[in-house]
C-alpha cells in the first residue's frame, strides 16, 4: 500500500540560486504524486510565499508556511507556522536576522530564540554526530513542538545515517520524521540546480566540487520510492505535523493607520469633511449636482469597504508635499475618482476632462482588493517625500515594497555561460546576442554572426539551461516608491529587510503580490517632467514676473496644437519619441481629448489589436464611423467606434455581455496576465456566448476578443492617458510660448526624457533662442535666463554641464562673485578657493574666456596660479603675456563636446558637409524636396535608437545634422545583418529610399555604413531605448 506523505522541507526558486523550480511547478507535481501537503521553506525568507499560496489554491493542495533557518554557530532548523501566532513569530525572526545584516544576507543568533515562539514548529536538521546538548537546548525552547528531521538521498551511508539519527531522537525523546530537502520539482532540473550552485559560489561547475549535490535525489519523489527509504512511522509523522499546521495567508488582518483622524471624528466623518473642503476649493462657485451625486456614490462605497483611512493617508502625503512646494500629481486609475480630485490627489477633473472615466476601474464592491493610488512627484525631491513617510509612521509601520528581479535572456545567458566555463570575452559576446529585455534565446543566424557554432553541443547546453532560468527570480530589489503603511508593526504581516540604499527598509513581498493579501500600497513615484515644469514656472516668474501653475495655463491654445501637429515636440512629455512624432501629423490633435488619444494610441495594446489605422482612417474621413449596435454607441463614440482604452473594454463587457462591474474589472486584470497564465481563456466563452445571445455577430465577437488580447500586451487606461495628457499639454504650451525658459528647465532637470542637453539646446537654437556659453563671470550652477534683444530671453549655460565640475565649487563662485566681480583668473581661483581640478575643468570648458581669453590662454593662466606663501605676499607674481596660437574651429568643437557635451559653434556635420556631399549624402534640409519612393543617402550623428516591443524587431534610429533630424527605419533582417554597425556607430550613413505620407518622412534603410572615424575623437553619445 502506498503511504501518505507531506513534504515539510522544500525550497522554491525564491531561495535564490538554490531552488531550481517555481512554486507552481512544485505544487503541480506534488498534487500529481498525491502528497497531502507541501511546505515551502525558503532560506530565511517568505518572499515567494504569496505565489506558493496561489499555486496551492489552484491545485487544491495544502500549503504549509515555513522557512529554513540556520542559526549562526548553532543548529540548522526548518520552522513551520502552526497558526497565526506562529506565522508572526516567524516573520519577527526573519526580520531580526535580516535587519542586522547587509542586504541579501542574514544573521540568526541563539539569543533570538530567548523570546517565546508560540505557534512555531521546529524541525531540527541534525547530523548524526550532533551533540545531545544541542538537542536539549532546542527542546527547552520548543518543548513538544520539536522534531528531528531525517533526510535520505540514496547515499552509501543512508542505513547508518538513519540508524544514528533514530538513536539520537530516542535518547532525547524527540519524535523523528522524514524530510526531502527538496530543491527541484523533478530530477530533470539537476543540471540547472548544479548551474545555479556554481553561480551562487562564483565558480565554474567543473570547479564547484563539494558544493554540488552528489545526485539528483533532492526532488519531489514518488511515495513508493519514499516507502523504500523510510520506516513507515517517519512518513506518518509528517502527516501529524501537517495536520497541526492550519495557518493560511487569508487569516492576516491588515489595518490602515488611524492617527490622521482628530478627536471628535471617525475615519468616515473626517474623510467627508476633507472632501467637502476640497469641493469648495475645486469648485468655488459650487459643485454641480452631477459632481455631488458622484462624490456621494464614491464616499458610500469607500465607507462600505472601510477604505477611508487609505484615502486620508494619501491625502496627508500629497498635502505635505504641496506645503513643501513639491509638484505632484496622481495618475492611473485614481484619476477615475472625483473624491481623489477633490482631495488634491489627482489633477484631472472627471467632470470636464472629455473622458468617460469609470470609477469601477478604480474601486469596486465586488473586488476584494484595496484601490491602488499612484502619485508622481518631482524626481529630484521624491526622497524628501519618502523620508516624510518614514518619519510620519515610523520604520516599524512603513516600508517599501520589493520587486522580484527576474532573469531575462541576456542575464541568464551570461550567468550560465560563465558557470559552464565559457571564456569571459565569449560570455559577453553570447549575452550580447540577446536583446536587453528579451526572454528568448538568440536564433542560429544571430549566433553565427557573433562567431558561435549553433550546432555545438556545449552551446546547445548553455542555451537550454539559460532558457530554463529565464523568469526565475534573481534577487529582491526595492520598488521605486511603492509604500506599505500599517496600523501595527509590519513584521506582524510580512518580514522586513534592509534595502541597498541607506535609510530605507523593504518588505519581502513583490508589489504584484500585495493585492492577493489585501495590503495597502501607495506609490510614491518620480517624474522628471514635474521637476522641469516646476523649474520652468520659477524661471518665468523670476524673469517676467508672471506666476503660472498647471491649473492656470490657458486651455485649448491654437498655437500650441499647431506646434504639436507639426511634430515640433522635442523635449515635451510623452509625445517626444520618434513613433509619437510620426503619428502627430496624421492625428493632428486639436483638443485636449485628442491629446489623451495621442498619448494612448502609440502603445502596444492599440497597435497589436489593430486599432490605430481604423481610428486614423475614420478621423480623416477615409472610412465611415460605424457602431456594432446603438447600445455601444455611447461606449465608442469618443473614439469613433474603435476601442482604444481599457475602460472601453470594461464598458463593452458590461453593456454587450451583461458583465457586472466586478466581472469587468476581473476581465481587465486577466488582460494584463493572459500572456503569462492564459488568464483570458475563462472569459472567451463567457464573453462571446453572452454577446451572441444578445444578437452580436460571430465575426464581431471574434474581432473584439482579438482586440482584447491586444490590450493584454499593454492596454492603456483612459484615466492614465488623461493624467499624462495634462502634463503633455502643459509642456507643449510652455515650449510654444516660453521656449527659452522651457529648454533651460529641461537641461537643469536632466537626466530625463529622450533627449540629451545637447539635443535640447540645438533644438532651442533652431527655434531662434540665443544660447550663451558658460562663463564664470555670469554662470550659476544651473542654466539661467538673461535679457536679449529678442522677445525671448537668452539661455546662459550653467556650470552643471561641465563634466567633472563640482556643485560646491560652483556655489562658491556664485557667492564670491556677488561680493565683487572677478578681475582675473588669479582673483577667481584665490577668492573661490578652487583647486587644480576645478581650475583645469573651467579652462578646458572655455568658461574662463571672459577673464583669460581662449582655451589655450586659459590653460596657461590656471597653470600659473600658485598658492601665495606669506614670505612673498607683497611680491607681484604676474607674468608677461605669452603669445599662444588660437584653437582652430575643429579643436574648439572637439573640446566643447569633450568638456560639456554640446557646442555653441558650428555643428559637427557643418564642418563635414563638403566631404559628405562628395559622398552624395543629403542633409535633413534637402530631404524636404525629395519625392516619395526615391533613393537617398543621408548621414548624421546617431542621437537615439529605439526598439519598441511592438515593432517586430524593427529599430528606429534618429540622426542629427546641422539642420535638424532624420528618422530612419531599420528592418529586422538588416538590423541582424549589420548589428554591430547599427549599435556602435556614432556617425552613420544610411543608403535607402524615402517614404513620405501625411507630412511624415522616413528613410527606409537598405545599407548602413559607419563613418565615425570622420569625427576623430568627438564625444557624442546616443540615448538608446531598447
Curated annotation (Swiss-Prot):
Gene3D superfamilies registered for this protein in UniProt: 1.10.150.870, Metal-dependent hydrolases
Principal location listed in the UniProt entry: cytoplasm
GO cellular component, one term: cytoplasm
Molecular function terms, GO-annotated: 3'-5' exonuclease activity; DNA-directed DNA polymerase activity; nucleic acid binding
GO biological process: DNA repair; DNA replication
Keywords: Cytoplasm, DNA damage, DNA repair, DNA replication, DNA-directed DNA polymerase, Nucleotidyltransferase, Transferase
Entry's localization field: Cytoplasm
The keyword Nucleotidyltransferase appears for this protein: yes
EC number of the protein: 2.7.7.7
Keyword DNA damage appears in the UniProt entry: yes
Reaction catalysed by this enzyme: DNA(n) + a 2'-deoxyribonucleoside 5'-triphosphate = DNA(n+1) + diphosphate
SUPFAM superfamilies membership: PHP domain-like (SSF89550)
NCBIfam families referenced in this protein's UniProt entry, alphabetically: polc, PRK05672.1
Functional note: DNA polymerase involved in damage-induced mutagenesis and translesion synthesis (TLS). It is not the major replicative DNA polymerase.
Membership in a protein family: Belongs to the DNA polymerase type-C family. DnaE2 subfamily.
Name of the protein in its database record: Error-prone DNA polymerase
Source species of the chain: Ectopseudomonas mendocina (strain ymp)
Gene that this sequence comes from: dnaE2
Amino acid at each position: 500500500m502506498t503511504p501518505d506523505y507531506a513534504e515539510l522541507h522544500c525550497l522554491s526558486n525564491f531561495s535564490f540560486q538554490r531552488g531550481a523550480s517555481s512554486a507552481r511547478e512544485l505544487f503541480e507535481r506534488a498534487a500529481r504524486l498525491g502528497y497531502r501537503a507541501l511546505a515551502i521553506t525558503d532560506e530565511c525568507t517568505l518572499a515567494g510565499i504569496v505565489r506558493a499560496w496561489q499555486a496551492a489554491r489552484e491545485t487544491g493542495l495544502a500549503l504549509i508556511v515555513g522557512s529554513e533557518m540556520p542559526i549562526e554557530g548553532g543548529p540548522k532548523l526548518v520552522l513551520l507556522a502552526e497558526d497565526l501566532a506562529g506565522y508572526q513569530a516567524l516573520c519577527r525572526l526573519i526580520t531580526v536576522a535580516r535587519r542586522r545584516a547587509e542586504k541579501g544576507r542574514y544573521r540568526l543568533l541563539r539569543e533570538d530564540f530567548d523570546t517565546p515562539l508560540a505557534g512555531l514548529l521546529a524541525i531540527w536538521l541534525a547530523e548524526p554526530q550532533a551533540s545531545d546538548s544541542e538537542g536539549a537546548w532546542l527542546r527547552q525552547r520548543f518543548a513538544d513542538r520539536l522534531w528531528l528531521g531525517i533526510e535520505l538521498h540514496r547515499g552509501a551511508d543512508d542505513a547508518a545515517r538513519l540508524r544514528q539519527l533514530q538513536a539520537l531522537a530516542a535518547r532525547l525523546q524527540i519524535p523523528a520524521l522524514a524530510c526531502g530537502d527538496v530543491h527541484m520539482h523533478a530530477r530533470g532540473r539537476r543540471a540547472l540546480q548544479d548551474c545555479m550552485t556554481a553561480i551562487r559560489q562564483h565558480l565554474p561547475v567543473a570547479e564547484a566540487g563539494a558544493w554540488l549535490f552528489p545526485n539528483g535525489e533532492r526532488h519531489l519523489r514518488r511515495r513508493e520510492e519514499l516507502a523504500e527509504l523510510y520506516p513507515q512511522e517517519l512518513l506518518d509523522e509528517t502527516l501529524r505535523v501537517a495536520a497541526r499546521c492550519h495557518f493560511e495567508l487569508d487569516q492576516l488582518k491588515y489595518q490602515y493607520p488611524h492617527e490622521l483622524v482628530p478627536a471628535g471624528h471617525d475615519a468616515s466623518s473626517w474623510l467627508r469633511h476633507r472632501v467637502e473642503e476640497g469641493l469648495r476649493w475645486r469648485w468655488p462657485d459650487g459643485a454641480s449636482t452631477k459632481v455631488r451625486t458622484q462624490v456621494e456614490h464614491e464616499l458610500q462605497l469607500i465607507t462600505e469597504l472601510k477604505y477611508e483611512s487609505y484615502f486620508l493617508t494619501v491625502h496627508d502625503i500629497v498635502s505635505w508635499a504641496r506645503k513643501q512646494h513639491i509638484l505632484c500629481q496622481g495618475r492611473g486609475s485614481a484619476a477615475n475618482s472625483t473624491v481623489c480630485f477633490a482631495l488634491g490627489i489627482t489633477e484631472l477633473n472627471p467632470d470636464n476632462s472629455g473622458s468617460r472615466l469609470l470609477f469601477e476601474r478604480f474601486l469596486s464592491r465586488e473586488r476584494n482588493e484595496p484601490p491602488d493610488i499612484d502619485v508622481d512627484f518631482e524626481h529630484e525631491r521624491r526622497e524628501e517625500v519618502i523620508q516624510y513617510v518614514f518619519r510620519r509612521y515610523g520604520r516599524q509601520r512603513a516600508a517599501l515594497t520589493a520587486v522580484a528581479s527576474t532573469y531575462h535572456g541576456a542575464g541568464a545567458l551570461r550567468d550560465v555561460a560563465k558557470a559552464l566555463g565559457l571564456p569571459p570575452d565569449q560570455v559577453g559576446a553570447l549575452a550580447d546576442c540577446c536583446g536587453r529585455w528579451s526572454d528568448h534565446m538568440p536564433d542560429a543566424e544571430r549566433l553565427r554572426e557573433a562567431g558561435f557554432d549553433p550546432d555545438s553541443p556545449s552551446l546547445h547546453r548553455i542555451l537550454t539551461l539559460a532558457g530554463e532560468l529565464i523568469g526565475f527570480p534573481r534577487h529582491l530589489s526595492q520598488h521605486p516608491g511603492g509604500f506599505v503603511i500599517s496600523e501595527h508593526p509590519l513584521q506582524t504581516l510580512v518580514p522586513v529587510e534592509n534595502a541597498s540604499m541607506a535609510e530605507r527598509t523593504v518588505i519581502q513581498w513583490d508589489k504584484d503580490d500585495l493585492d492577493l493579501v489585501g495590503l495597502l500600497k501607495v506609490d510614491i513615484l518620480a517624474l522628471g517632467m514635474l521637476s522641469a515644469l516646476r523649474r520652468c514656472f520659477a524661471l518665468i516668474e523670476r524673469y517676467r514676473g508672471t506666476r503660472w501653475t498647471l491649473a492656470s495655463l490657458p486651455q485649448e491654445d491654437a498655437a500650441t496644437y499647431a506646434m504639436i501637429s507639426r511634430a515640433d515636440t522635442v523635449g515635451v512629455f510623452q509625445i517626444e519619441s520618434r513613433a509619437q512624432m510620426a503619428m502627430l501629423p496624421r492625428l493632428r490633435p486639436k483638443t485636449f481629448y485628442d491629446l489623451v488619444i495621442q498619448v494612448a494610441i502609440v502603445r502596444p495594446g492599440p497597435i497589436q489589436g489593430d486599432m490605430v489605422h481604423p481610428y486614423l482612417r475614420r478621423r480623416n474621413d477615409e472610412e465611415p464611423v460605424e457602431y456594432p449596435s446603438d447600445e455601444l454607441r455611447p461606449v465608442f463614440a469618443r473614439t469613433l467606434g474603435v476601442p482604444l482604452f481599457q475602460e472601453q473594454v470594461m464598458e463593452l463587457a458590461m453593456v454587450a455581455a451583461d458583465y457586472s462591474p466586478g466581472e469587468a474589472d476581473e476581465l481587465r486584470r486577466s488582460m494584463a496576465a493572459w500572456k503569462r497564465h492564459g488568464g483570458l481563456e475563462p472569459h472567451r466563452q463567457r464573453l462571446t456566448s453572452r454577446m451572441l445571445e444578445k444578437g452580436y455577430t460571430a465575426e464581431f465577437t471574434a474581432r473584439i476578443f482579438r482586440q482584447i488580447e491586444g490590450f493584454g500586451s499593454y492596454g492603456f487606461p483612459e484615466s492614465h492617458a488623461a493624467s499624462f495628457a495634462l502634463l503633455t499639454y502643459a509642456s507643449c504650451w510652455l515650449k510654444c510660448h516660453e521656449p527659452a525658459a522651457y529648454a533651460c528647465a529641461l537641461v537643469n532637470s536632466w537626466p530625463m526624457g529622450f533627449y540629451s542637453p545637447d539635443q535640447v539646446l540645438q533644438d532651442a537654437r533652431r527655434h531662434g533662442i540665443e544660447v550663451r556659453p558658460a562663463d564664470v563671470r555670469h554662470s550659476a550652477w544651473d542654466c539661467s535666463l538673461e535679457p536679449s534683444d529678442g522677445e525671448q530671453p537668452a539661455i546662459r549655460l550653467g556650470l552643471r554641464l561641465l563634466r567633472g565640475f563640482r556643485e560646491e565649487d560652483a556655489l562658491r563662485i556664485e557667492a564670491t562673485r556677488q561680493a565683487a566681480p572677478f578681475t582675473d583668473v588669479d582673483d577667481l581661483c584665490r577668492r573661490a578657493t578652487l583647486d587644480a581640478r576645478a581650475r583645469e575643468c573651467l579652462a578646458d570648458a572655455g568658461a574662463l574666456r571672459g577673464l583669460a581669453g581662449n582655451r589655450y590662454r586659459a590653460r596657461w593662466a590656471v597653470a600659473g596660479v600658485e598658492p601665495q606663501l606669506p614670505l612673498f605676499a607683497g611680491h607681484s607674481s604676474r607674468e608677461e603675456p605669452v603669445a599662444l596660437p588660437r584653437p582652430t574651429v575643429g579643436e574648439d568643437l572637439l573640446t566643447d563636446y569633450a568638456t560639456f557635451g554640446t557646442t555653441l559653434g558650428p555643428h559637427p556635420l557643418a564642418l563635414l558637409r563638403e566631404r559628405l556631399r562628395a559622398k552624395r549624402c543629403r542633409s535633413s534640409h534637402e530631404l524636404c524636396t525629395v519625392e516619395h519612393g526615391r533613393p537617398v543617402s543621408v548621414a548624421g550623428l546617431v542621437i537615439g535608437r529605439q526598439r519598441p516591443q511592438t515593432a517586430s524587431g524593427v529599430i528606429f534610429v534618429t540622426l542629427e545634422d546641422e539642420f535638424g533630424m532624420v528618422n530612419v527605419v531599420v528592418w529586422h533582417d538588416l538590423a541582424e545583418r549589420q548589428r554591430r554597425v547599427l549599435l556602435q556607430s556614432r556617425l552613420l550613413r544610411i543608403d535607402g529610399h524615402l517614404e513620405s505620407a501625411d507630412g511624415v518622412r522616413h528613410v527606409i534603410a537598405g545599407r548602413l555604413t559607419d563613418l565615425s572615424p570622420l569625427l576623430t575623437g568627438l564625444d557624442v553619445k546616443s540615448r538608446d531605448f531598447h
